Structure formats: C-alpha cells, structure tokens
C-alpha cells in the first residue's frame, strides 16, 4: 500500500513565505491539556508546556524562521511559520528537529509520523 504524499512535489519548502503547519499526536491521544481544568481557558499539561517551550525555541535555533502564531490543542498543534530568508532552513527540517526535541525531553513518542502543511 502506498502512502499519500503530504508535500507538493514541485515546491521548495525552503522558499521565503508563510507555512501553516499542523502536527498531530500519535493515535490522536489527548496529551496537551489538563483533563479537568475547571476554567474556560485551557490549562496546558506537562506535555503541553514542553511543546510550548520548544515552539518558543524554534526562532533561536533557526534565526530565519519566525513562529508567527501557534495554538496548542488537546491532540495536535497548529502553527504559522514564516521563513524570512531563502535557503536558511526548510520546513521539514524545522519540524523534524522540533518533534525530536519534544520526544527526547518527554522520554516518549508523542507524534504522528508526519505533519500537514498549507503553503
């Protein structure tokens, strides 16, 4: 069985521009919010705080990448990445290293194999 490609074949993912990226947890497991948060504003779980920590570090690791906006949902995250310089970094490398850093700190695999994007 063939896996559907998530990337545009003819597009360079290191081109300057904005990228809307979604990353899901493995098996859609709800890991990032506290389950019994009594308030209307969601409270991040320990795993969710780790995700936020590494989202905030992306810009220091990749100076040509800005995290314009992000939302941490119970079982996935959304972010808008702005690549500000050609050839400085590509979206796949940024996401691979982000996911790896979170996995290493948490000591468990939390991510779905790939990520989804809109260019």
Predicted regions: what they are:
Residues 1-119:
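Short catalytic/metal-binding and nucleic-acid-binding patches
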């Amino acid at each position: 069985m063939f896996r559907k490609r998530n990337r545009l074949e003819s597009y360079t993912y290191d081109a300057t521009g904005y990228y809307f990226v979604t990353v899901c947890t493995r098996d859609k497991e709800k890991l990032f919010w506290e389950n019994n948060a009594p308030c209307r504003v969601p409270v991040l779980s320990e795993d969710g705080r780790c995700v936020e920590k590494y989202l905030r570090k992306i810009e220091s690791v990749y100076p040509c990448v800005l995290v314009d906006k992000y939302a941490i949902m119970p079982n996935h995250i959304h972010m808008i990445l702005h690549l500000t310089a050609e050839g400085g970094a590509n979206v796949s490398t940024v996401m691979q290293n982000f996911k790896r850093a979170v996995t290493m700190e948490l000591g468990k695999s939390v991510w779905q194999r790939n990520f989804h994007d809109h260019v």
